[in-house]
Amino acid sequence: EHPECDFEDLAMDFMDIRKRVYVFPKMGEKAMFVAIPTSSGTGSEVTPFAIITDADTGTKWPIADYELLPNMAIIDADFMMNQPKGLTSASGIDALTHALEAYASIMATDYTDGLALMATKNIFTYLPTAYDKGAADPVAREKMANASTMAGMAFANAFLGICHSMAHKLGAYHHLPHGVANALLIELVMRYNADPAPVKMGTFSQYPYPHAKER
């Protein structure tokens, strides 16, 4: 909607002071933003975030502003049935990482925790089946679609952690799928997070592993 905007004004390092003063242009005045995901992973259809890769330098620039939030999200698993196995696994791990980091976030709330935990449960239950059977198991595809969106809703409000920060750099430098970069880092990040807050991290995941004694 705003071709006059300079991308350099939007793509800034996380600690760049300009982020505190730059006003993102008002969106939605010419058209409604309807997002229809075709993979079960990013949750972008319900988040205010975008990642833009600079083709010349390979740098991945994260952009965050609620003007980027779609007006409507249509979650229809029919658009996701024929994801290849590589996309299914990488995007599924991305969704799981969203849920885990939103749950561990210092900005987590009862609302985001509920979404993150249910997303985690469904991913553990249905990602292996979605990977193995693909379109032959539409229930698994639907559950993964819902899990991805729930994880997106969780981290849109609780935000993410250092796993995603490092995964963006790792993926850009080594040309890795984002979900694969997350998969390489998430265990180390969880161990790091568990050191000061073992009780909360012990809750991951309650379903195939023992329950934490307390929240």
Regions found by a protein language model. Name each.
Residues 41, 149-182:
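Glycine-rich phosphate/pyrophosphate-binding beta-alpha loops
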Residues 46-158:
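Carboxylate- and glycine-rich phosphate/diphosphate-binding segment that chelates Mg2+/Mn2+
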Residues 128, 167-171, 187:
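Amphipathic alpha-helical segments within well-ordered protein domains
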Residues 20, 57-59, 82, 167-172:
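Glycine-rich, charged/polar anion/phosphate-binding loops
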Residues 39, 99, 189:
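Active-site pre-Tyr helix/loop in NAD(P)-dependent dehydrogenases
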Residues 1-78:
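Glycine/threonine-rich beta-strand-loop-alpha-helix active-site module
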Residues 173-215:
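Gly/Pro-rich interdomain helix-loop hinge
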